[in-house]
Amino acid sequence: SGKGGIPAVIRVGSETTFPPFEFTEDDKYVGFDLDLADAIIKQMGSKMEFKSMGFDALIPAVQSGQIDMIAAGLDATPERAKQVAFSDVYFKDNGYCIVVRKDNTTINDWADLAGKNVGAQVGTYQVKLAQEAKAAEVKQLDSNSQAWMELQANTLDAVVIDQPVAM
């Protein structure tokens, strides 16, 4: 244990296909959320131990004690707030967007997702948005990287994602 009952090491979990917040660069985990978590933990006099995991595993990992905190673009929904404590909001994004291939001519807004095959990362609010848009199938993918590959392979018509990540 560290000073004042603060652990010497704080275990941080994240899903690392969410640039610019969490991603892999030159075989290292980097990004805004990780830098912020590391700075806060250093200020506390502790060291950060990082664990990469699936987005849908983050809350269960905190609940089971595998990690101490989450550093990720995790929307503070009422359902999630019943399971874990949230910090103050430190980044407010401009919402969600639809990503399509360049050759797309039929999807221009949310209503156009009806009857289409749409991808979204498992465990995210975007899954709910795609379902509400009455997509024929909402494919829940393990990572944003997988979503981009499926979109390029033409197995998805669109991907719903946070706007900063899509940019």
Predicted regions and their residues:
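Extracytoplasmic small-molecule ligand-binding "clamshell" domains
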Residues: 5-74
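Short secondary-structure boundary segments
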Residues: 16, 74-75, 102, 122, ...
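Ligand-binding cleft/hinge of the Venus flytrap
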Residues: 24, 37-46, 109-110, 123-143
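Short helix-initiation/N-cap motifs at beta->coil->alpha
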Residues: 34, 49-61, 105, 139-153, ...
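Alpha-to-beta junction loops
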Residues: 45-47, 63-72, 116-117, 136, ...
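A ligand-binding cleft/hinge motif common to bilobed small-molecule-binding domains
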Residues: 73-83, 129-132, 157-167
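Short Pro/Gly-enriched coil loops immediately N-terminal to beta-strands
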Residues: 84-97, 114
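Flexible hinge/capping segments at coil-to-helix
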Residues: 100-117
